[in-house]
């Protein structure tokens, strides 16, 4: 069963563009300087998660195992508990988890952390993320820890580290298909004998894209023998184009690439 929940423009702005991506995303990536907090937006984040819980509740059976994903939905389990559901609920955080000293500087941090206590299992990408989570919760009065189990405020939660990866064998097999080999051969015939540095990322300030361009520029300055030899091709897929900081980083990258090409480029090399 697939259930859809329509969001109003205000919901989208407060919940998604606002608290999710203007507070949680930068804070959880240790960028407090980019966080923009608004009481209206945190209320929108609560409101939409309550709506999700209310829409989901009639569809749940007592035997269902509930698995919730990522920072947009941290309080969802708490609202499901309020609705009377005692199902086992797991949560996986797809992004990093900040150090306690960073998190404590963020508005509503204790409410967010209290929301995690409604889960039975909380999963992280790395052991460092799980350790940051444990260290913060151990500041709660009466919290105890036993290996990967935490008891806090009358709730027991288990944490785990489940790194996400790709299907290496499938990708390797795809690279050796006849179609792939033909495309590679065509590319070799067209390409000049140069060093190609290729990056593929979302257009996001957490990816270090300006730093990458600055590093390439520095390479060309300090080692001019790489001019006309090395080519940097950066593929940056646009994302969250309604969030101001993403508009700014796109402009910064366009200006940087233009400046580098203007300074070092030639008619047959950019």
Where are these regions (language model features)?
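Catalytic cores of carbohydrate-active enzymes across secretory and cytosolic contexts
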Residues: 1-270
């Amino acid at each position: 069963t697939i259930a859809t929940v329509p969001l109003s423009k205000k919901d989208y702005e407060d919940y998604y563009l606002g608290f999710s991506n203007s507070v949680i995303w930068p804070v959880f990536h240790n960028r407090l300087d980019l966080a923009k907090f608004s009481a209206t937006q945190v209320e929108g984040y609560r409101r939409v998660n309550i709506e999700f819980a209310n829409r989901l509740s009639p569809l749940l059976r007592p035997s269902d195992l509930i698995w919730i994903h990522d920072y947009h939905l941290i309080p969802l389990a708490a609202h499901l508990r309020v609705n009377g559901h005692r199902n086992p609920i797991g949560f996986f955080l797809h992004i990093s988890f900040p150090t306690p000293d960073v998190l404590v500087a963020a508005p509503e941090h204790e409410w967010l952390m209290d929301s995690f206590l409604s889960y039975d299992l909380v999963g992280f990408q790395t052991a460092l993320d799980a350790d940051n989570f444990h260290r913060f919760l151990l500041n709660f009065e009466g919290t105890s820890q036993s290996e990967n189990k935490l008891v806090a405020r009358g709730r027991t939660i288990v944490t785990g580290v489940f790194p996400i990866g790709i299907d290496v064998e499938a990708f390797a097999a795809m690279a050796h298909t006849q179609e792939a080999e033909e495309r590679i051969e065509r590319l070799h015939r067209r390409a000049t004998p140069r060093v190609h540095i290729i990056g593929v990322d979302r257009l996001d300030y957490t990816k270090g894209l300006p730093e990458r361009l600055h590093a390439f520029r520095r390479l060309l300055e300090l080692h001019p023998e790489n001019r006309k030899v090395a080519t940097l091709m950066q593929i940056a897929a646009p994302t969250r184009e309604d969030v101001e900081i993403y508009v700014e980083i796109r402009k910064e990258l366009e200006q940087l690439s233009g400046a580098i090409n203007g300074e070092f480029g030639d008619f047959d090399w950019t």
